[in-house]
């Protein structure tokens, strides 16, 4: 995640550029939200009033060296999918502020869904995963989302403690390295910018394995309504760090490493500049049954080096035998990659047209030890399609008037089988790409989003999906059909 200060700095640089009427309206609108307000010696406490930026706030407290902003949140959506319909309602609260070099933020939203088709709506879908509360029924369920962080910043960096998502890389409908489709998790994070052309990031996160540790069960009492055993889950963690280089204007090159490990925390993975892969090999005595699940990833992005054009590529390497990359009989190319590009102001001002291709080979994200899969609460932290798939996409973005975003996408997806642990670690040659083909999917998606006032959105989308299954019983809940979403939302999305 990027900070509000970074957003403000980027917006203020645009004030030095000659903008047309539409661009100036949008700039002024976003400055209402992100422009810093200088405090005074006397505290100003206001409720349901506009602040100095003319931004309506639920409550704000501004004074020298401290400010606090509080806003309610809520949404109402009607979702119709494959002949079923349900209503989603939410309410919550967010606040954020700063005290000199310390900053903080909090986000809480409680959701209730009533109707039919809620389960099928999220299967094989880029919708965010949820952790259901209480006892869901066929026609009703409740879940919540909470995020928050406290950070300390200095001129060239910051350190944070929080609960949030991580995003890394580019992708129109999924990111192969880290995506925000999973439920949020606790983390500590270090961001350091020693020079203008280099950036370093480190994170250690506490994940949810969703696997009960049977050895840790013990009696908690007799007669409790939920049973007498104390249940504990296998501890699961992730450490990741990356370097971003900016050798010239518009060109960013990034390289990083991550490791998912389990059972107990390890101080070696708290060292931001450690080489996780080598360290893990040493601590496990090169015993695969004692080791962790390590990954490498790289990315390159070229923006506006060719006028109005963005080109990008990412690669996620789970396992690879460098000496036999091109030897089909012995290779273990368990990796994924994304290649994409877009052109803006093509045919019409503010029209962006783009294309993207993603391929993730078999067995990427999985591990010999189930608690070390590249997942958070059973959902892949990378691309939502998992592994053994490819996706070809065409997309368009258009902003005909200020604050209105239109989006259209066509994608074609092929999905192979999951395979077995024995096939992953023992088969030679490895099963081919798209082995045990499960399904082919083609879909059209269109969406509009209009931000009427700051953080108040009018939303709508239409999606038409056509599935072809090798075996019609593979996913009986997922069939061809249409999905329509309409609603309103207030607050950070």
Predicted regions mapped to residue ranges:
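Exposed, low-structure sequence patches enriched in small/polar residues
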Residues: 143, 246-493
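Outer-membrane beta-barrel channel domains
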Residues: 3-5, 10-252, 257-259, 263, ...
